[in-house]
């Protein structure tokens, strides 16, 4: 295993059970979840976002037209005005030595980070499987960081070896 310290609402690369009602969440609790990662072209590294939602309050949604009975969906969601926000961490994993490091990309309070994936090749559009590659080179990747109020978006490039971020 590459990691052993993931906990609920601060897991590695997963979606946290979004779009599952509470019955499905309990039923799928022990099933393996996919990790949302992007690989370097040489497959020596991969990047992922780890989101800490442990302090974010829960939101409850009732699906009143579910059949045969209404269902409840519960997930973490920051409502306007609440101080508890999800905290996103950008991690790079090195497959050769099975280590990971967090890159310092913080610029805005309660920012969102978006990793850029490489454009899909037209020749692969009909393939059953397409690799998830990051946009950039083997040693550099591109991402965006967006302020909570959406008034500022930085397009950034990060050198994964030095950790240097250039907006």
Stretches found by the model and what they are:
Residues 53-56, 147-151:
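Short glycine/acidic-enriched loop and turn motifs that connect beta-strands
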Residues 94, 156-159:
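Structural recognition of the beta-propeller blade-terminating site
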């Amino acid at each position: 295993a590459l990691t052993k310290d993931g906990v609920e609402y601060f897991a590695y690369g997963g979606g946290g059970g979004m779009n599952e009602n509470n019955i499905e969440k309990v039923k799928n609790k022990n099933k393996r979840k996919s990790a949302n990662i992007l690989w370097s072209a040489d497959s020596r590294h991969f990047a992922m976002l780890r989101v800490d939602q442990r302090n974010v309050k829960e939101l409850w949604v009732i699906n009143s037209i579910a059949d045969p009975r209404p269902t409840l969906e519960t997930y973490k969601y920051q409502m306007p005005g609440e101080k508890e926000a999800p905290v996103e961490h950008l991690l790079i994993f090195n497959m050769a030595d099975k280590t990971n490091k967090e890159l310092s990309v913080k610029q805005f309070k309660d920012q969102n980070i978006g990793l850029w994936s490489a454009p899909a090749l037209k020749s692969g559009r009909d393939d059953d499987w397409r690799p998830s590659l990051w946009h950039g080179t083997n040693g550099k990747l591109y991402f965006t960081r967006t302020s909570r109020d959406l008034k500022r978006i930085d397009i950034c490039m990060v050198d994964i070896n030095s950790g240097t971020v250039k907006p």
